[in-house]
Amino acid sequence: MNNSRLSLSSGRLRFLLRTSVLANVVLLVLLVRWADLGLGSFDLAGGREDTRHADVPQRTVTRTRTVKFEAPAPTETVIQTKEKVVEINSCSLCKVAPHVCQEIGEDNFRRAVGFMGSNNRLRRALARLRRGQPFNMGIAGGSVSLGHGLHTDDEERGPENMHRQIFDWLNEKFPGKGEPAIEPEGSLKAEGRNGFFNGAQGGVGGDYFSMCFKEHFPLDTDLLFIETAVNEENELFVQKPFELMLRGFLDLKSEPAVINLQGIAFSFRQLVTGGNFQQPGVAQFYDVPSLSLNNALMPKILDQPSLIAEYFAEGDTDGRSTVDGIDRRHIGLKGHKLFAEIVKGYLELQMCEMDRIEEEAGHNHIDELYPLGHLPRLLATGKYDETAVTPRMDPFCLSANSKKNKLSPVENDGWREWSWKDKHYLIADKPGSKITFEIKTGLGLIQLFYQRSAVYGFGNAKCWVNDDVDKAHTLEGYWDEPFNIGRSVDLRDDLPPGTHKVHCELLESTADPGGKHEFRIISLMSI
């Protein structure tokens, strides 16, 4: 009996709950319908609103309007969000440069962008170009940037060179007032003309350009491309000169955009060249984007070695880097074309992103949208310190390859000028030959830059500063590395500010296995 009553009570309770829920749903539907018919709001506490006192605030008006006007909002928000997603996705490498994706594949194109960073400097420079301001483009690179292997009439400046391809494309998009200036004596931006300055030097790396970059392109350069990875050894000492080079570029008053280009070669002891190992971390520290032909092509070439013949240059029959008629150190026409298209695609990607950013912001104020930032106060290659600040560096260079500050002795006995193609030196081959230079320093550092090789028969020289012969350095031109390139040495780093004399003497002793003595000086540098 009791169980029966309990079951009946439970059934009534469930019925009452269902009825209550249904009644509340019906009431809500009626309220919404009431509002849609424009019959005013309904006060849940006291019945229908008294419309005779419209100027008296009603606490239920807000609730009614929320139902009436805010209900469609989520649909509109979703639509807007989807549109923005489409815009963002439209700024993709394969959309702005589909032909590159077709050639190397989307994955390899993405790999080519080794480091993107904020791109604020690059976007600032592109924003100036889009406003119609003239621009200068400079290159700090080695023999690849000079176009060795293109086998054209003008490898360095001709239209087949990858840097010239980039410049011509930019000049077409953002033409100056007159004809573009291809390696003029100096900047012609004052005349409204765009300028191309290929400052590349064969057989040098970051240690040369960290001190001598002012000799090879104007200080009001807007776009700077670095291409020294192939010429760098896989040693930690490569990092600091590369860092000093970056700081020197980024500290220019013209606020240049700097892009680090990393090439590819198959003629060295390591499959991946030293710069591809030693440069990326430093570039990231300074927010400098890096584009890598090595990353783009290496997977394809490892799977299909015959592609080396497509992307690299025809080699000299007696060349040390020539294998089966192909120069495995210098890319050819197709390699230059691909590298240029990768860079152009990356620049297009930035301009696409700029369109989106400026549309969303409703303006194109450069300083607000693309803040410049500042150089890190410490060196990436230095030790952490709570308060230390790296001083601004103003390097000075006397170079055999410079038209501005040519390396010229104040005293000379047995040394002479000599050049091979675009490389210039002061050389001596008779032991006992002496030469003296004068150079100024502000922070007390003087460096000598000289060539090293395993095959040219290089000997030894002794160099010192002022009369401090006891602090002389013995420099060996010979080494067993597969590079014929320049290397720097710190002659002194403790000198007082002012002008100092640097002396060098060719020695009888030599490290060359063949007993030869020739020694080549490229430049003298100071800070």
Can you annotate each of these PLM segments?
Residues 48-91:
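Fungal extracellular Ser/Thr-rich, low-complexity intrinsically disordered regions
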Residues 2-51:
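N-terminal signal-anchor transmembrane helix specifying type II single-pass membrane topology
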Residues 11-21, 30, 85-108, 314-527:
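Conserved catalytic region of serine esterases and O-acyltransferases that act on ester linkages
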